[in-house]
Amino acid sequence: MSFQFSLTIMLYFQMVIMAGTVMLAYYFEYTDTFTVNVQGFFCYDSSYTKPYPGPDESSDIPPVLLLSLVTGVPVLVIIVGETVVFCLQVATRDFENQEKTLLTGDCCYINPLVRRTVRFLGIYTFGLFATDIFVNAGQVVTGNLAPHFLTVCKPNYTALGCRQFTQFITDANACTGIPDLVIKARRTFPSKDAALSVYAALYLAMYITSTIKAKGTRLAKPVLCLGLMCLAFLTGINRVAEYRNHWSDVIAGFLIGISIAVFLVVCVVNNFKGRRTEHEHWPTENLAQMPIISIPRVENPLEKNHLTAFAEVT
């Protein structure tokens, strides 16, 4: 099997994985394939009686704005960053650190600029859908209630026989409110907005830190990266302030987004470092500069006895 044929097979395999990830995220997000777990509640529980904040579109950070930022900003920054790095390498003739043009499949030569850009954006997109899947799976399995759940649920406490605050209601038909709002209020753990925002911010911050090597950016890079993380933190704070999520929901979303971003950057794209061919791992000119390690010789008792016997015979 030729090397080009192996690359073609791997390319198709990765496309199948990406398509499957997108389809799974679609089924979680826009279909009723996965039923939300119906979690019970205590009568008159003050943890779930916060006022209804309105639809997500009325939030200070609506879904359209959030999705536009987590998709548009990383794409723009990575494209501009890779273009600048490539142009600087060509201008300074820094061909050692520049990736080579490779043959993919049977006919296609991919430029290093295009290859790095597609690789980093592809991994980012995969992580974005993976974060969405993790969050939706957690929401479906737990069915955790929003702070305004009882406000939209509108349970009939008299019919349910609520005479004590400690009485636990497990009836799936206890709510008399709008079904769509009730289902939405059952899907809060973990917070999707917190997970997506911190994933995008951390991935972009690690890209900026690992890629930008220009002089005079000793303070610019930390300020820019911390600014991105601050925006993600404010997104989580906004979810709690508007009574759309609990603190535990936001913290869990942060942990999911951070974990996926760190895993992809460290283990998959190798901290955004360029790939090198096999003969570049150990340059010939550097072999002479390598320290020589002398390993002590361990005598074999059998060999020693053999030499002694041979000396006696002679």
From Swiss-Prot:
InterPro entries: P_Acid_Pase_2/haloperoxi_sf (IPR036938), P_Acid_Pase_2/haloperoxidase (IPR000326), PA_PP_rel (IPR043216). GO terms for cellular component: plasma membrane. Keywords: Cell membrane, Membrane, Transmembrane, Transmembrane helix. The keyword Zinc-finger does not apply. The chain crosses the membrane at residues 5-25, 61-81, 120-140, 194-214, 223-243, 250-270. It holds the Pfam family PAP2. It is found in: Cell membrane. GO terms for molecular function: phosphatidate phosphatase activity. It is a multi-pass membrane protein. PANTHER family: LIPID PHOSPHATE PHOSPHATASE, PHOSPHOLIPID PHOSPHATASE-RELATED PROTEIN TYPE 5. Induces filopodia formation and promotes neurite growth. This is Phospholipid phosphatase-related protein type 5. The gene is plppr5.
